Amino acid sequence: MKKKILVVDDEDFQRDLLNKLLTKAGYTVSDAESPEVAFTLMKKEDFPVIITDLIMLDMDGVEFCQRIRERNSHSVIIALTGYADLYDLEKLKQVGFDNYLTKPIKLDKIQPVVEAGFKKIKNRKKSHR
């Protein structure tokens, strides 16, 4: 399975940093500056893992996650936040997130969460056979 990731963040710096770190780690990365751009990309391609910022201008990450779940329940969705104290994993799971990452972004923090996401996808596919 090709390890494709979609990164959604309205901050250019964060998006570029994630793209560089994940590409360097061997993943195939696409990115979008808004949920609307992300939905356009998702119509053309399947992304097993989606990493999205929680606070964005046009649509927040929670609404974005809920809309993804309405369309596609198999992707692993990882929240990205600089405000870890405002969110807890259980609340995020209730709205459809699989996991979360906190800023500042570092590869040694991201890679285990992303790999767990790909493992979860593999298990979901096995259970649907």
Could you say what each language-model-derived stretch is?
Residues 16-24:
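Charged docking surfaces used in two-component/phosphorelay signaling
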Residues 31-40, 61:
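Helix N-cap/capping motif at the beta->alpha junctions
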Residues 45-51:
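Active-site beta3 strand of CheY-like receiver
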Residues 40, 62-73:
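Short amphipathic alpha-helix used as the core "switch/output" element in two-component signaling
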Residues 63, 84-99, 112:
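Alpha4 helix (beta4-alpha4-beta5 surface) of REC/receiver domains from two-component response regulators
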Residues 105-114:
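C-terminal output helix
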Residues 56:
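Receiver (REC) domain active-site loop signature in two-component systems and cognate sites
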